[in-house]
Amino acid sequence: MFLLRPPTPAQVAAFVARSREQAPSYAETGWSLDGRTPDWARSGRHRVRVGEGEACWERAKAALRGGQMFQDWVLRPHGEASTPLSRQGATVVLLVRHFGPWGRRKWGLYSLMTNRVLYLVDEPDRYGFGYGTLPGHLVRGEERFLLERDAGGAVWFDLTTFSRAALPFSRFAQPLVGAAQRRGARHYARMLVRAAGC
């Protein structure tokens, strides 16, 4: 859903209601959990060290659960920020500003996009989730947001993706879509590291 201004609460609510009824926009759901990539998709990976120690591990988990990696790149509009990323089956709504200034009633090109939380990882040394795109998203595919703690106590954030442009114009602009995804991965990592404060 493309808009020239940030969406109203009513627009977000209607969009969410439609999205909750939709299945993911591709067949290979859950493949990112094992690092697999369908033949039609391009894969990506971005891994950074968050810090070390038990306190860092707990803060990083809280930041991931709270969606802190989305700050300043995409927003979780209005009341949708309360949608838990730690609930399998949850529909996650993101507001992407493609260009134009941030803020209410500001011009620009915005899009609402939805993803479904497909799986959770909650193990002693691994924590995270994976979500997949729903119809109307600019791409089709998955992202896995995973924290890992190694034997020395270091905490790592590992983002893996597989995707392909989904809409006619985004297929035409696949190189730009790929560049935006790589930029997004770096941004997600930077925001998560900042939020964890290790």
Swiss-Prot record:
**Which N-terminal stretch is annotated as signal sequence?**
none
Q: Which domain of life is it from?
A: Bacteria
PANTHER family assigned: UPF0548 PROTEIN
Q: Which family, according to UniProt?
A: Belongs to the UPF0548 family.
- Report the protein name in the record: UPF0548 protein DR_2035
Q: Please give the organism.
A: Deinococcus radiodurans (strain ATCC 13939 / DSM 20539 / JCM 16871 / CCUG 27074 / LMG 4051 / NBRC 15346 / NCIMB 9279 / VKM B-1422 / R1)
